[in-house]
Structures are given as C-alpha cells and as structure tokens.
Regions:
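Residue-level signature of the cytosolic catalytic core of signaling kinases
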Residues: 1, 47, 74, 90, ...
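Short active-site loop at a secondary-structure junction
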Residues: 9-17, 38-96, 131-142, 217-220, ...
Length: 341
C-alpha cells in the first residue's frame, strides 16, 4: 500500500497525512513532509489539520442524531427553528439544507469575517434565492451554517459541544473540534500557499473564543487527525454513534449534483455508484489545505488524506486535482488485496 501512495505523492513533495483502513484494521497510517517548516516539525498521523468541507458530514451526522433522539424532524420547515422567515423561504426545510436544494446562495461573506450567529441568520434570510426551494441542487456553505444554528437551537448547547458529546466522545475522538481539544500550537499544521509561504494555522486568522465566526461554522473549519477519522469510520461501522436507520438516511443518494451526472448528494456526503460498489466521499479545501475522506460502503474500506500545502507553483502540481487519482489507486489496491484473502 505504501508503494501505491508513494507513486502518487512521492515526486510531488507532498506534505500531509494518509490513512487507509479495511474494516477496523488500519492498513496504512503515515505522515509526509513538514507540519511546520520553520520549526522543522514533521507531519504524523497525530498532526491536527483543517478538514475544510469534510466538516459537513459531521454537521449532517449531528442533524440525523438529533432526529434519532426525537429532537427534530428533517422535514421541519426552517421557520420552526429560525423564527419568522421571508415569504420566499417559508417552504425551505431542514432536509433541503442538508441536500443543498434550499436554493440559497453559497455564502454571505468571507470565511474570516467577524459574523455572529444572529447576523448570519439575518443575512442568509435576506439574500435572494438562486432557485425555488426543492427544485435544484446548488452547493451552499451558508445552508450548512444554518444547520449549525438549528443544531444549537434543538440541542440547547453549542454546535461544537453537541458534536463532542454525541458524536466524538462515543467514537473516542479526542482530537477533533474547533477549540475544545485545546491543542498546543506545535500540534497543528501550518498551512502554506502555492509559493510555499506560510499562511499560519487556522486559528491565526480571525477566530472567536469558541471557534471560527459564523460564515465558516458548521460548513467547514473543524480540525482533526487521521487517527480520529479512523475512529469515526469504526464508529460508523459498528453503529456506535448512529443506528442503521440514521445511517441509511445519511448515505442515501437524494439529488444529482448535476443533470445527467453520476454523482449524487446525500446528507453531507457525495455518493457514487462505482465498479467496487457504492462510495461515499467529501472533500474540503481553501487553496492552502485540502482534505479528502472516502468510504466504500459495504466493503468497510476507508481512505483519508489531508495536506497543508494543496498547490505548488514551483512544482507545478495541484493536489486538489490529483486527489481523486490517489484515492482511486488506493481503493483499487485494497479491493484487489481483499479478493486474495
């Protein structure tokens, strides 16, 4: 397996972590390159990285957990949780936020703008719709931030504390969150741009006391480790966090990402029907960091990789574009090796 990964990343000065699991067994777990060039700290499977939009599948899991607990219904109109909404948005449901079919705009400001929860809701509800709710898929980060608001309203606690209590703690994930893990700075990867210049750590940018401001909260920005993502995979396999019904809801293909395309969106996951079976995946990045989480449903396979330098002008590479090839190569090797067992 190491040879497969090396064939994709070895010549590209890859900096990050790769973890591959078959069922509950970790097949490969390795760090590459530097987490911090200045301090000469190497990346390891314990290094904390920004997950980007891989955060969305945790937000979706929190929503179906709340439904499992009887605290909300995904068919609830958002007005049940956000209060009065403009006439054009009265038909929007929680489920439409989950599937990016609410017709909302992608964002209502920059990720690092100091936007409070109240102002996020005000801006999101005031923004014109792209399409009539329920009629088309339009990826919306603001929709997932609204889900984080709904999670807080339905749970009576903060978004991060609910995830920590109901998802991360049962899965034995101690290194995932915004601020609750209280990491040392040296444990978190520094991000680098395409020129190799430091862009700091996620919390070196405008950051509230409890995590990122609300243009990012719920749709991105969680930090985690490869080891914790493996624990999440195991928790899904043994239904420790979400029961079978909840997981069927999570991984059901619901809306095509594009007309005539072969990829569908479920709740926080992109779903594909492939030669090795149904695949669920999501990626996330900001031009500096990039993460990709893939699960082959029914086979118990998982591939996670993350980098703190997604692109290189000097090297002429873009790992956001190469990521699918890396994941596909690893999955093919996993399936082939499983067939020989």
């Amino acid at each position: 397996m190491e040879n497969v990964v090396q064939s994709y990343v070895g010549a590209k000065s890859f900096a990050g972590t790769v973890l591959v699991a078959r069922g509950t067994d970790v097949v490969l777990s390795k760090g590459y390159g530097a987490a911090n060039l200045e301090w000469e700290i190497p990346n390891t499977p314990a290094t904390k990285f920004r997950l980007g939009s891989v955060t969305k599948q945790f937000t979706a899991a929190a929503v179906v957990k709340l439904e499992m607990l009887g605290r909300l219904d995904v068919h609830d109109p958002i007005s049940d949780w956000l209060g009065p909404v403009p006439t054009d948005k009265t038909g929007i449901t929680v489920q439409q936020l989950l599937t990016h079919t609410a017709g909302l705009v992608d964002a209502v400001g920059d990720d690092y703008q100091r936007l409070t929860r109240r102002r996020l809701v005000t801006r999101a509800l005031a923004a014109p719709l792209r399409t009539t709710p329920g009629t088309a898929y339009h990826y919306s980060n603001v929709g997932y931030s609204l889900l984080a608001v709904i999670i807080e309203k339905a749970s009576g606690t903060t978004y991060e504390r609910f995830l920590a209590r109901e998802l991360f703690r049962p899965a034995h994930m101690t290194q995932t969150g915004y601020t609750l893990p209280d990491w040392r700075r040296s444990e978190v990867a520094v991000e680098y741009d395409a020129r190799g210049l430091s862009q700091g750590r996620p919390f070196d940018h405008p950051w509230a006391a409890t995590g990122p401001w609300w243009n990012l909260r719920g749709n991105g920005g969680l930090l985690s480790t490869a080891r914790d993502l493996a624990r999440w995979h195991r928790a899904l396999l043994d239904h420790r966090v979400l029961d079978r019904r909840a997981q069927r809801a999570l991984f059901r293909p619901r809306v095509p990402e594009r007309p005539g395309g072969d990829s569908w969106y479920g709740y926080g996951w992109v779903l594909l029907d492939t030669s090795v079976g149904p695949v669920a995946w999501h990626n996330g990045g900001n031009g500096w960091s990039y993460a990709e989480l893939t699960r082959v449903l029914g086979r118990g396979l998982m591939v996670f990789w993350v980098t703190n330098q997604a692109r290189s002008t000097a090297g002429g590479w873009n790992l956001e574009r190469l990521g699918t090839h890396l994941t596909s190569g690893v999955v093919r090797r996993l399936v082939a090796s499983s067939a020989r067992l």
